[in-house]
Amino acid sequence: MSIVRMTDLDLSGKRVLIRQDLNVPIDNGQITSEQRITASVPTIKLALEKGAAVMVTSHLGRPKEGSWTEEDSLAPVATRLAALLGVDVPLVRDWVDGVEVAPGQVVLLENCRMNVGEGKDDQTLARKYAALCDVFVMDAFGTAHRAQASTHGVIRFAPVAAGGPLLMAELDALAKALDNPAKPLLAIVAGSKVSTKLELLSNLVNKVDQLIVGGGIANTFIAAAGHHVGKSLNEPDLIPTANQIVADAKTRGAEIPLPTDVVVAKQFLPDAEASVKALDAVDADDLILDIGPQTAQRYAELIASAGTVVWNGPVGVFEFESFSHGTETLARAIASSKAFSIAGGGDTLAAVDKYDIAKDVTYISTGGGAFLEFLEGKTLPAVAALQARGQ
């Protein structure tokens, strides 16, 4: 990958602007999950250790450009960052036209989405960002799919543009999983709708050896195979698409296994009575809310023999205890597998947390939308810009 890496640069005495993803949930001024802040600390520490004058910026929420509000301010983030770094981290409110910072110091630049022109990747604004620094570091993989002034434009105009450790770790892991995977490559794609994961399914079916579908997506594939799905969430108009994806898999010698048993209920409620049924025994008033134990075991065996596992989405309504066993079985199979494993997407990360398997998954992507777009085979604007600068 032809991207200049921050880790390879001499930053001594240099002004370094780092774009991080510090978009954390804040409730009444209190940060409720600091995972992204914690993740950014090693990059900032490294820049300080290398003797740089460090400026860090990020977006937070979706503020109106050109107006400052307390609820959109990075002030709570600055306080937490200072505690984690053990140094003062002043928050600079108006920073586009110049920032005072000395080597060995770090400042946090207020929410970049407050700047007029940020969202539209305004060239004038991007040039102003670039003028602040000797080196620009893009370390926010979670926003790499957005062409904005702080994630794309500035990369074009900064004297030097580099990928930060977090971004590069993410890209290295994704390349290892998709570009040069240890075989067999197994992907788990689950979610409520085929329509939202259509590009993902269509791209992965050309790469994987096995594609396990789950959730509402699986129901559409089950219906496409001629089985009844009762009242289950599914998309009848996408049955031809599902059949095409199955045909594409077959042509390549890949497999899309379907459940042989499922867990059903009459109502979509946490305390609904759960019944395990053979796939052929689903009634007209049944809702399929999880894969059955027999299917979960079969899928777990596929995971055990995989060389690479890409996981995006829980296979059942795992928030409801009675319909969580399929997801838990697969999660534990991934955790105990020797395969290179990568997991990403909000619901997937919630399942990783619920079953406490983070330490057993090779790489956990915090990228969200960027992770999905990469899996869909799309070019991420920030990555393309960094590659162009690395030539």
Curated annotation (Swiss-Prot):
Keyword Nucleus attributed: no
Documented EC number(s): 2.7.2.3
Pathway: Carbohydrate degradation; glycolysis; pyruvate from D-glyceraldehyde 3-phosphate: step 2/5
Binding site for substrate: 21-23, 36, 59-62, 113, 146
Location of this chain's protein in the cell: Cytoplasm
GO biological process, alphabetically ordered: gluconeogenesis; glycolytic process
Keyword Iron-sulfur: no
UniProt family annotation: Belongs to the phosphoglycerate kinase family.
Protein name: Phosphoglycerate kinase
Originating species: Xanthomonas oryzae pv. oryzae (strain KACC10331 / KXO85)
